[in-house]
A protein has these predicted regions:
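Single conserved hydrophobic/aromatic residue that forms the stacking wall/gate
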Residues: 1-7, 11
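Short, charged low-complexity intrinsically disordered segments located at boundaries
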Residues: 10, 92-100, 124-135
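Conserved donor-binding loop and adjoining core beta-sheet/short helix segment
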Residues: 13, 18-52
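Surface-exposed beta-strand edges and their flanking turn/coil or helix-capping segments
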Residues: 30-32, 39-42, 93-94, 140-145, ...
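Acyl-donor binding region in acyl/amide transferases
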Residues: 37-115
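Acidic, proline/glycine-rich low-complexity IDRs
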Residues: 107-156
Length: 156
């Protein structure tokens, strides 16, 4: 069974839970303006004390339960952008892709990972997660892929 989670009352759509290993996590959904063709939120998973977390399937199950609940309440797209401060973004991207691949409902979703290069040619990992039955599916997916292409375009 996943971890018991608490919704923070002061902040809409932010959840906190503590693993059996004493690691504190928060999951947040914040409205995002990147995609204009439909409602979108940025998804954030934070280990806010920075304690190293061992592999823990209950963390995955808890996070995916929270994501599932989000999609049951919202006809929105989720943007997942990996934290880059410590150089572990590629590992985070792979881990989240794996979590999503074993998620029971994954066939109902498009999970579209992309790499965005910054000015220093560093790889930044992002993904669009959207229900296949979202009424704005085609518009949001094409806007996301066009935005990634634009961000990766080389200035002349």
């Amino acid at each position: 069974e996943p971890y018991r989670r608490q919704r923070q009352m002061c902040i809409r759509d932010r959840f906190k839970f503590v693993s059996d290993f004493g690691v504190s996590f928060s999951v947040a959904f914040e409205e995002d303006e990147l995609l204009q063709s439909g409602e979108s939120y940025q998804f954030a998973l934070t280990n806010y004390e920075g304690i190293k977390s061992p592999r823990d399937p209950k963390v995955r199950d808890t996070v995916m339960c929270i994501v599932d609940e989000f999609f049951r309440k919202n006809q929105a797209a989720l943007l997942y952008i990996c934290e880059t401060g410590d150089g572990m973004q590629k590992m985070r991207s792979r881990l989240f892709s794996f979590w999503f691949s074993v998620y029971a409902e994954h066939d109902n979703f498009l999970f579209l990972p992309q790499i965005v290069y910054d000015e220093e040619e560093n790889e930044n990992y992002a993904a669009l997660i959207i229900r296949r039955d979202n009424p704005r599916f085609n518009d949001l997916v094409s806007e996301f892929t066009n935005t990634i292409t634009l961000l990766n375009g080389k200035p002349d």
